Amino acid sequence: MKFVGRKKKAYASAGVDVDLGNTLKRNIQRLVRRTHGAEVLGKIGGFGGLFRAQFRDMREPVLVTSIDGVGTKLKIAFAMNKHDTVGADLVNHCVNDIAALGARPLFFLDYIGCEKLEARVFDQLLHGFSRACRSAGCALIGGETAQMPGMYRKGEYDLAGCIVGVVDRPKIIDGRKIKPGDTILGLPSNGLHTNGYSLARKILLEKMRLKVSSRLPRSTLTVGEELLRVHKNYQPLLAKVPAGTIKGLAHITGGGLTDNLLRVLPKNCDAVIETKRWRVPGIFQILQRNGNVAEPGESRAAPLTRRRQSRQEGTEGAGQSGRLIQSAAPSGVERIDPEEMYQVFNMGIGMVAMVSTRDAAKVMSILKAKQIGHIERGSGKTQLL
C-alpha cells in the first residue's frame, strides 16, 4: 500500500493528479444523473455507458451520429475565465448537426483534454454539459478527462463531444426532394455560435486592440459577453414541424451559408440567398467594418462551386460526411471579399430549412423563421444576391 501511495504522489508531481480526478468525477455524479431517464442503465464511472434503446414508435429506426468541438471560441472562455457556456455550446452544436437529418438526440459523451485538471473549470464545464443535455432531452452517459502535462498551455484545454440520435428511416431529411421553386427559410442565430472565432479574435483583439472586457461599439455587451453567447439548439423547434414538410436542413457552422447549403442541395439545384432579406446582427457589421471587408455588392465573385469535404477553421466546424480538412488561423487580417463573410460567419442565420412554397408560411410561423431565398435550376451552387 505504501508503494502504491508513493507512485500516485510521483504521478501527481509529474502533473497528473489521479486522486483529484477521481474526486471530481464523484462530485459531478448529481449533475450527470439529472440527464438520465429510465433508459440509462449501469452506474456512473464504468468502462462504458449503457443505454436501453426502445423505438416502438418507429418503423425502421436509424441511428445518427456526430462528433464536434468548439474551436477557438475556447480562447475567449480562457480569457473570460468562464467555462459553462462553451460546455453548452458543444452539446447544442452536436444536437443541431443530427437534427439537420431529422434525428432526435439519445445520448452524449464528452472529452476534455487539459494541461492540468482544475476543479472550478471542470465543474463549470460539467454544469454546461448537464444543462444543455437536460434541455435537449439527451442523456450524458460518458466522458473522458485527460490530463496531459506539456501538451497544452497552462490553464488551457480542448473539448470534443460525440452524440448519438435516432430517426425513423422514412422521416430522414436528406435534401433529395428539394426542387426548383422551393422556398429557403432562415432561423436566426445567437451571434457567432461556434464559428469564425480565429478571424473575429484577429479583428477585435488585435486590429481593434479591444479587450474581452471592452464595451463593443453600439452595444450594451462587452467583447467577451458577445463572443460567449451560447450556440442555439434548434431541435425542439424543428421537432414541431409535421414530418415530411421540411425537405432539407443545413446547420450553418464552419463554411457559413455558402458552403453548408451545398451539403444538402441536389446537383441540379442552386440555392439563391437574398442577403437583404434579414438584418445582419451588429457583431457581424463590426467585424465587416473593421476587418477591411467590402460591403456586399462592392464586388461580386462568381457563385462558389459545390464542395463536399472542406471546411473553414476546423470545428469551427467539422461535419459528418467525411473527415474534413482544417485550415490554419489567419496570420493577418487582409481585405476579404464580401462573399467570404458568408463563408466564414453565419451572418445571423444559424439553421436553414428548405420547404415547398405552399408550406412556407406554416413552417415560418412554427420556426419563427424568415424567408431568405429560393431554389432554382442550376448545378449545385450557392448564389448570394
Residue ranges and their predicted role:
Residues R30-N190:
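Glycine-rich phosphate/pyrophosphate-binding loop regions near the starts of catalytic domains
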Residues K2-S13, V121-A139, Y152-L159, K211, ...:
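Glycine-/charge-enriched secondary-structure boundary and capping motifs
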Residues K2-E39:
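N-terminal amphipathic/basic leader segments beginning at the initiator methionine
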Residues V16, L20, V86, N195, ...:
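A generic structural signal for residues located within well-ordered alpha-helices
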